[in-house]
């Protein structure tokens, strides 16, 4: 089965160490709420603020999830320290998109996907199936790998922080973006399909992607 998606808008951010100059303070004026946000949450809030998503369904993907919170929990266990309730709460995969949905009062469907290197491809497939209902969806992938001693195990990812979002709908138009056998050096493989689409998105033409289900 093949489903064509039209990409209506795209936005992405990435950095080799840490994405800076975010508008978190303006987007999240409540200090108590803002202090609870993980870095992934801040990135997702940032990209979603670029879209009109009051009633949009969201498909979110991350291979590594909330790596810092998970690392903090494991370190506390190793050191026989008390676990942080905030780290425990923030360690689940849907943390970032859940905070964003609360902030933007989005009460619609949210699906979280984690599938290793194929995460962004699975997000596209899930989004394509959901788009058959006829409405617009937001597809997001993010990775925040900038944690202590990450250099000891990382030898292939240049950009430790990255986030990308697409606004899509189903389409009958001819595909114009080929996502087969793509290469995207320096990025986590888990976001490469959606990041490739975003980087090749143009507002001056139709942006149609064929998704094989």
Model-derived features: where do they sit?
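Conserved "HGTGT" condensation-loop signature of ketosynthase/thiolase-family condensing enzymes
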Residues: 1-122, 129-213
